[in-house]
Design a protein with these regions (language model features):
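A mature extracytoplasmic/lumenal domain signature
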Residues: 53-55, 60-62, 84, 95-97, ...
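Extracellular low-complexity Ser/Thr/Asn/Gly-rich intrinsically disordered segments
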Residues: 2, 17, 41, 75, ...
Length: 202
């Protein structure tokens, strides 16, 4: 069943906003994970993780959504634009999505609610890579996962606003020289609509 959120008293400040305001990032530091945004399920358009104890986080605060999702006939690709040590670094997840998910538009992301995908290098699991300025190279993935903890629909003033996609991830990978790459504490809280969901399945 599709989940529906009616923004009411608890989100009074958000009800006064226009739809365009949902595209802004709302960054709140996590006191338990210094440098990362809190884990949230409010569509704050933030994400982050530690990469070998270095902070990877959303590329800009307060700007338009710095991420996008692309669906085709075989997979769903989620690209998170970010920073690590002052340089551009993008984290790209590729999830195997078969026809049972019917990802025709962003509302269909609700079918992923509560789903968890293992991360490794097999065709039936989620894969991940880095892009950007001198990104780490991954040659193998030892173990990991990405979980969609909560996916929910937001209605504001009786109109569809967005789908909130929130979840967690972590994985251990290895580079070409055998060096280990540990990604831990990963979290994302994304507001998705027709502006950042692209469908190539048609």
């Amino acid at each position: 069943m599709k989940k529906l959120i009616i923004i009411a008293a608890a989100l009074l400040a958000m009800t006064a906003c226009s739809k365009s305001d949902f595209k802004q990032t709302q960054y709140i530091d996590d006191p338990d994970y210094p440098g990362l945004p809190i884990y949230s399920e409010m569509g704050y358009n933030t994400y982050g993780a530690y990469i070998n104890e270095q902070v990877f986080t959303v590329s800009s605060h307060g700007s338009n959504r710095p991420f996008y999702l692309v669906a085709d006939r075989e997979c769903l690709t989620m690209t998170l634009y970010g920073w690590r040590e002052g340089t551009n670094l993008n984290m790209v997840f590729t999830l195997p999505i078969d026809s049972t998910y019917h990802l025709e538009d962003y509302h269909d992301l609700l079918t992923l609610d509560g789903k968890r995908f293992d991360i490794d290098t097999t065709a039936t699991s989620c894969n991940v890579k880095f892009e950007g300025y001198y990104p780490p190279t991954i040659t193998s993935i030892y173990s990991g996962y990405i979980s969609f903890e909560k996916i929910q629909q937001v209605i504001v003033d009786k109109e569809d606003a967005e789908i909130i996609v929130s979840g967690k991830f972590q994985f251990r990978a290895f580079g070409p020289d055998g060096n280990r790459l540990d990604v831990v504490g990963g979290r994302f809280d994304l507001g998705v609509d027709q502006t950042n969901f692209i469908n190539f399945r048609r």
